[in-house]
Amino acid sequence: MTPFFLNSVLGGVLATLFMDVASMLVRVTGLTAGAPPSTIGKWFTYLFHGRLIHGDIMASPEIPIRMPLVGALHYGIGIALAGAFAALCSWQQPQRGAFAFAVGFGVLTTVLAWFLMFPAMGWGIAGTRGPAQLLLTRTSLVNHALYGLGLALWSAFLAPLLIRSKA
């Protein structure tokens, strides 16, 4: 396996895991409040049934949520984003100087939630029509910054120990 592939997969999984754990810890401070996982799971599950856009996801009929598929999609997105980050960096072996860039990249991925996911859930751009509008917007920003921090930690500390690049 190539260093690029390993960095994409391992970096994506670890950055997503870091985001998931850190966001739970941040949530207890009251700074953020996640949309209920069942709501996001409902939207993801509807994707598997061919429906992307909802008037309001909360009002859409209940559907059996396939959490293993939802989890796989969640981590798959994390891997794909880590691959995009790696490609932007021409990342064979991550560099310690990419720390700030990784956090910035994580923040930049917020546009996916603000301009794709929230509007598709019927919550408007940046969640401005969703439940607890600004809290939802801030939560997305914080969570994606945490994903970027996970990428930064991977690239600065773990990848150099675990992946040998062909020089």
Region roles according to the model:
Residues 1-167:
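Juxtamembrane/disordered regions of integral membrane proteins
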